[in-house]
Structures are given as C-alpha cells and as structure tokens.
From Swiss-Prot:
GO terms for cellular component: large ribosomal subunit. Forms part of the ribosomal stalk, playing a central role in the interaction of the ribosome with GTP-bound translation factors. It comes from Acidovorax ebreus (strain TPSY) (Diaphorobacter sp. (strain TPSY)). This is Large ribosomal subunit protein uL10. It comes from the Bacteria.
Length: 168
C-alpha cells in the first residue's frame, strides 16, 4: 500500500522526532521472521523503552538527514527494522539479544554519538551494562571503603571491650 504525500510527511516527522530524542539507532534485517516473533520483539523493545519501526528506506533516510544518524544512511537498503532508544545501550541490547535466539534477524549496523557502528560495534554496545546497573556498581564502589572502615572500627571496639575488666 503506497502512502500519499501527507502520510509520508507525517511518517518523516514522527521518525525525525524519534531521532532527535534518541541516543542510539540500530538497524537490522528482518527477512523471514514470523509475525509472532516480530510481536515478541516489539513487546520486549517497548518494555525497555526502545521504539522499533519498519519504514520505507527512502523515508528513513529523509528522516535522519541532518541528524546524528545520518552516518548510516548508506546502510539503509533491504527490509529493515529501525530501533531508536534514548538509553545509550537499550536498542542494541534488545536487538542483539533477540538476534541470539532468532537467526533470521540479522544486525546490519547502527549509530551512536554521531558515529556509524558495524555489526561488532552494535554487539559491543549491547554488552555494556545499562545506566542503572553502572550507577549501582558506582554506589557499591563508593560504599565499600565506608563499610570496611565500619567493620574495622567495630572489630577494634570489640577487641578493646574484651581487654577491660567488667564493672562491678
């Protein structure tokens, strides 16, 4: 079904607004994926804050023109699904995890911070922990010296308490 000019402009505007808010774009070929599998992928993506879209490549190229994702315009050929995410690693994680279990989804590439990513770049990005996990790890690192100091002081107080005679 072809779109008329106003519908195409609406699609371009919607994708342009997605691209403006997103940090990451992942592009994957979905040839041969069943509707049920595609639905699972979309549900998983939605739960992680990733917007997945199947777009005409010419409309996608126009939508990302002039944005940080313009660097992947040459990769936009064939039946592709586009994953935009505001979280730096969410789109890469969702698509890479799904591609591990479904060999019909083939990662083509993507873009992050104005740089084009190849397949390995997307997979490396997917291996980075999420922002929340990194913050939790940082808090753990910051709390570790404090808790160690408290344990040492507690042991020192217990040791000093053992050496003194009990009050009568």
């Amino acid at each position: 079904m072809s779109l008329n000019r106003s519908e195409k402009e609406a699609v371009i505007n919607e994708v342009t607004s997605l691209a403006a808010k997103a940090q990451t774009l992942v592009i994957a070929e979905y040839r041969g994926i069943t509707v049920a599998d595609m639905t699972k992928l979309r549900v998983e993506a939605r739960s992680k804050g990733v917007s997945l879209s199947v777009l005409k490549n010419t409309l996608a190229r126009r939508a990302v023109a002039g944005s940080q994702f313009d660097v992947v315009a040459d990769q936009m050929t064939g039946p592709l699904i586009y994953g935009f995410s505001e979280d730096a690693v969410a789109a890469a994680k969702v698509v890479a995890d799904f591609a591990k279990t479904n060999d019909k989804l083939v990662i083509r590439g993507g873009a992050f911070a104005g740089k084009a990513l190849d397949v390995n770049g997307v997979k490396q990005l997917a291996n980075i922990p999420t922002k929340e996990v990194l913050l939790a790890q940082l808090c753990g690192l910051l709390m570790s010296p404090i808790s160690r100091t408290a344990v040492v002081l507690g042991a020192l107080a217990a040791k000093k308490g053992e050496g003194e005679p009990a009050a009568a």
